[in-house]
Amino acid sequence: MSGDARKTAEGLAHLTGFGNEHASEAVPGALPEGRNSPQRAPLGLYAEQLSGSAFTEPRAHNRRSWLYRIRPSAAHPPFTRADNGAIRTAPFTETAPDPNRLRWNPLPEPPAGTDFVGGLWTLGGNGDATQRTGMAVHLYHANSSMDRVFSDADGELLIVPERGGLLLRTEFGLLHAEPGQVALVPRGVRFRVDLLDESARGYVCENYGAPFQLPDLGPIGANGLAAARDFKAPVAAYEDVEGPVEVVNKFCGNLWTATYDHSPLDVVAWHGNHVPYTYDLRRFNVLGTISYDHPDPSIFTVLTSPSDTPGLAGVDFVVFAPRWLVGEDTFRPPYFHRNVMSEYMGLIEGAYDAKAAGFVPGGGSLHNMMSAHGPDRETFDRASAAELRPQKIDDGLAFMFETRWPVTATAQAARAEHLQPAYDDVWQGLQRHFRPSD
């Protein structure tokens, strides 16, 4: 929360391009030329590969980076079990999957001294982390910067800030994410989160499955949606710190801790494509109708985690960014829907065009597969009678985690005080308008 951290965050340099083969060195000459693991790595460093995919996965899907570090990652004492806090991991068996529509207000204020990891609160998810399938929805609310380091062996983390800026100090370098931006931390990458404001709040998608990638564009063509060039990767930056550093590792659903005698954020140079990124959601190139009808929300996909069935995602990350609505003879808000996919929605700022009230920044809603949902009565009545002039939607930024499997809520989410008890009421006032004579 210091001014120094804010100044550091705002002055960062970056590499650009999602999925690129990046290379960076914090000290000239630290990156070996022409080979990955020379007999003696430059500057007395250790060469180490971090694999985000199996060695033999197809080249287009292969993720790995080579790190050149002061100490090898293997140089640490045994890990011991730590308290999981409010973090839960798939398979989710505390409650039964629920077909009811659910909506939550924002998380309550945490106790003083709560850092990013301590402020994680699991809402629910699906799949099995040990089988590398499925996902989890977490929220976070923190009021203290981390003085420990965290890594997640169970999946990659898509962090969606809603309030308060974050400075992520990773093995690859530093990244800065504000509300309206997202940060993607690959599986196994160590990092620490500094808060840039008095507190920070937001959402996290923990993806146990295939790494997120840009969606195929099909008939859209070569351009549109999220552009690869707008994703920012860090330049190398390292900590040369001797002394006790706590490292927390999430492994098969549990937290484990060890005290290193040095900082593990000691990578002086690196190259590869298994790297963290940030992305500004306002750069999303929104596509939509210029004739009639509301397009399916897949047109708003930023990133997708593919499954073994083409087009059927383990999880999609979708954003409803500022856009124009111009459809003629069209009900312009999102339509009434029953979906084979399950949808968790969150709100970063403003309002969402399908809900007049109750869906607030920091809150969220869950509509499991085949659970009917759509605009509330006020939105339906207003949109059905609206004059169809071109309309700019620029007062809100909502997103969705959409997944192929039902999302089972955790016990803490199903019983939370901030769970709205009467969410179904938003649809109860919808009137009968049927007139057979028409």
UniProtKB/Swiss-Prot annotation:
Pathway: Amino-acid degradation; L-phenylalanine degradation; acetoacetate and fumarate from L-phenylalanine: step 4/6. It catalyses: homogentisate + O2 = 4-maleylacetoacetate + H(+). GO terms for molecular function: homogentisate 1,2-dioxygenase activity; iron ion binding. Fe cation binds at residues 337, 343, 373. NCBIfam families: hmgA. Belongs to the homogentisate dioxygenase family. Hexamer; dimer of trimers. This is Homogentisate 1,2-dioxygenase. It comes from Streptomyces avermitilis (strain ATCC 31267 / DSM 46492 / JCM 5070 / NBRC 14893 / NCIMB 12804 / NRRL 8165 / MA-4680). The lineage of its organism: Bacteria, Bacillati, Actinomycetota, Actinomycetes, Kitasatosporales. The gene is hmgA.
